[in-house]
Amino acid sequence: MIKFTNGYVLSKDFELIKEDIYVKGDSIYKIGKCDEKADSVYDLNGNLLMPSFKNAHTHSAMTFGRSLADDLPLHSWLNDEIFPREAKLNGQDIYDLSMLAFLEYLTSGISACFDMYYHPDMMAKASTDLGFRTVMTSGLNNFCESIQSVEDYYNIYNSYSDLISYKLGFHAEYTTGKELISGIAKLAEKYEAPVFLHASETKAEVEGCIKRYGKSPTLFLDEMGIFNYGGGAYHSVWVTDEDLEVYKKRGIWAVINAGSNAKLASGIAPVSKMLKEGINLAIGTDGPSSNNALDMFREMYLIEATQKLNDKDAASTDPIEILKAATIGSAHCMGLYDCDTVAEGKKADLIVIDLHKPSMQPINNILKNIVYSGSKDIIKMTMVNGRVLYENGEFKGIDTEKIYYNAQKATDRLR
């Protein structure tokens, strides 16, 4: 059992408290006084213990494309640069390239990712081997996977390990035919399950859907029964008031990817409006080929900055709400209700924020500092499922050079 003491704790009510935290095995055992003796003591030294970040949308194995095909709009980037290279990917590539992404997540205080990609067997193996938490979903489209494979994956990976789970999904309306979309809707009905996909990422995507079906992606997919049990819409940039009414009615998660949307010039999601309307909000980085960083601090700041610019209102968004979206919101979007907060009985997915870094001083408002001036260098420790995987700038029990070598080897072949 580990005792965390002598520092701040971000409580489940998002308040800063000063209590001892005891972690036993993979879970938070006790908050406050404990009669049992700890095996080890972690002196927080005045720093902050808080729930980890959760990355609610990514494509981890796309590390191969970092700085390889930049400065292009989404559809040119996908069709000319990414899809041809993805056709060459094999399972071992997915394993090696995902491992690299997992390392980067840990340095940003991210303990779990929501990954849409291929070869879920190798993604699950990589995540489990490292001790990282991954929620997977299907990238089903007209060219790969099938309704049967999605159902098979759903049943296999929801009982694979404590670190792995699987959600129904498909790539996007513009890459997936009506028959396949109908098949996913039937699975959602069968399992009473939410569905996740890219939606309303670009203006061209929305215009294309209106041309095909006479309505926006959100309205079309809702009509098809995709959101009968909720789900998530990655990006949610070009959404209308009518779309947001569907989000509200169905409990759809708007998963914001500010870095990727800015870099690809896709647009700015109306986050301030979403917050005012009570829309469920989560945050993701998108993949390392389109962002190109896997950095939750950058995402939080970009959301804040772009909203204020877009709205021409310095008070349009509250940084504390954005911090909640990156932690509790993303966790709930991913179905990770058991590791969303610092509370007794929750899984110990925790991070320590170094308050002694220059960017965190002076201490006027710790939580605002995390969003406005925080960066990856304030992550002192990342714990996943009760295991410390990253601490003081070092990875614990992980052969990083092997991971770098294997990822480079895969990248060289795909280039």
Indicate residue ranges for each PLM-predicted region.
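Divalent metal-coordination and catalytic microenvironments
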Residues: G7, I21, D26, G46, ...
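His/Asp/Glu-enriched, well-ordered alpha-helical/loop segment
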Residues: E223-G230, S272-K357, S373-G374
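Alpha-helical scaffold segments that flank or form the walls of functional sites
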Residues: R66-G131, E151-Y160, A407-R413
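Active-site microenvironment of metallo-dependent hydrolases
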Residues: M1-E19, K24, C34, K324-R415
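Active-site gating loops and adjacent loop-to-helix segments of metal-dependent hydrolytic enzymes
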Residues: F64-D96, L130-S138, K203-G230, R250-W253, ...
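Catalytic core of soluble alpha/beta enzymes
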Residues: E201-G225, G230-G231, S236-K249, A262-S272, ...
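Metal-coordinating catalytic core of metallo-dependent amide/deamination hydrolases
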Residues: M123-V237
